[in-house]
Amino acid sequence: LLTVRSGHLSLVIDKENWSMRYERDGELLTKSGWRDLSYLKTDWKGFAYDKGSEDAYMRQQLGLSVDELVYGLGERFTPFVKNGQSVEIWNEDGGTSTEQSYKNIPFYLTNRGYGVFVNHPEKVEFEVATEQVTKVGFSVKGESLDYFVINGPKMKDVLKRYTDLTGKPSLPAQWTFGLWLSTSFTTDYDEKTVMSFIDGMFERGIPLSVFHFDCCWMREFHWTDFIWDERVFPDPEGMLRRIKEKGVKICVWINSYIGQESALFEEGMQKGYFLKRANGDVWQWDMWQPGLAIVDFTNPEATKWYQSKLKMLLDMGFKTDFGERIPTDAVYYNGADPVKMHNYYTYLYNKAVYEVLEQERGKEEAILFARSATAGGQKFPVHWGGDCWSDYESMEESLRGGLSLTSSGFGFWSHDI
């Protein structure tokens, strides 16, 4: 036997059959038996035809004890206890009524007082007491697998150690914990409409901390150019001043997609600030608006360029929407694997915006209203639960998502009503 120790945690390896036991002060936490750590080929035709790592996967199965319950794996709107669920760690824009998630975190913890973090940015597939009801399985494509087993002994100790590894959020300012009011899907509004919303809250005795302008503060199909639509907001500076005089903070909707009609598109294209196709063309699609491009945050100059546009709006906070629909066939400035970047892109996006606020306003006042996330994204608070319906069933879904996310290392979370 080979024993590796770290504090109260030990890994005991049987060198004959490569089974493993994870123990805390001699007590078994979880184990990997014979063939639980596997190298799998999905289309193997024999040694003569083997093509190396193509269609290869690494899989690990770790044992569950009697009555052991699994939590976490990001913001999931499915049942809070994850036993019996198949989970894909792959960011999608699926709302709160599906098994998809905006914030996929390859980390789970159990009521036995330990956690497991699979250290891969790409897709990780979990089988939580499904393929075998006494095991949690997880697999990644390729020929290597990197994961951490994190000791407690209490569940909150697991989260502390996990965030020691991946980062901790700062404490948001007190005003951020108040009620936020949004234009949401109201697409035809002007200053008069906005003021009627705000005044209507005060007239009803409802305290209001933040007013949020959703996408239509900019001209339609010009998302994102960071320019107020002068047709309905001819005096944005004056309007913002009048809102602040009421003691209300301001948040505006942004994303990292630049539509072809945006004033920024030509500049970004000429300077190489967008994701590209293999032939060197700008990667574009029509999912949100015609011909949109996506800012390449692996390019330091593109990041500075995007941040410079935000600095013009620094009297406001930012709702960093989207960040999930990231292509897997794009070419990045730094040569990054686009499959691994699909989930990780949102980290760079939110980091770029948060850094501007932190530099200009200080850590105490830096605040996002972000929808997408990956492991480590908790360092850029705060996150919200995405698109939901205004009914009790959807509230239940959202609350399950928030509980799962805060079981995955995120300290702050909000949701729509």
Give the predicted meaning of each segment.
Residues 2-174, 182-185, 191-192, 196-203:
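Catalytic and substrate-binding clefts that recognize carbohydrates or anionic sugar/phosphate headgroups
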